[in-house]
Amino acid sequence: ELITQEQEQEIWQIIAQALRVERLARQDKIATDMMRTSQVKMLLGNSGEVEINDFGVKFWLDVTKVMFSSGNVTERHRIGNIDMSGEIIVDAFAGIGYYTLPMLVRSNAQHVYACEINPNSIKALQNGAKLNNVEKRLTILEGDNLSTMQQVYSLADRVHLGILPSSKKTWQSAINCLKPSGGKLHIHMNVEEEKIEDFVTYCSDSIAKLAKQLGREGIVSVEHVEKVKWYAPRIRHIVIDISVK
């Protein structure tokens, strides 16, 4: 109320010039809705469309509509360093392609089936795939993943479950997506630091129990536990790599 809108724009112009940028925006907390809608507000400029180059992978998004999860950078790089040559992958929570694109570009996955419900994220993923020239190796399954994953039962060598705070609701579907010979699961969870060891055991036992119930009993083993970041005081974002044979 102390300055006019014109004066405010002049201030943003000065700041933009000092930073050598063309646009400015304000980042508020990510919405808590199912879509995790972006709360970015443009201060200078009208378009929120950006391209991000991370670890040799190009991402596209409109920052006013979807978020870019910068805190998971180490995990994106780790996944991108895994050799997935010849593998069929199901990404149960694809978003804008945080892990889908590294798996296609860096890991050399043969094909990724990406499940996503948010139209804005799907647009971003499609554009990102084109930027990386991998659109022919990507199939987007739009809608609720508990339904769309049924389209790829018994096809996958690997299933990625990258959602927080818990991916538990998709564990059964993920097992069903694995080939009859088995495969690997990447399970993201938020866990209290002092309970990580117990939770890893619980997770492994639960996957083994579900596999048996589904008539897919086999050898279930934990291959790796990655501590990605602190999510909150005492709460870790972890990824459990599980092999099902």
Kindly give the residue locations of the regions a language model identified:
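SAM-dependent transferase fold signal centered on methyltransferase-like domains
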Residues: 1-245
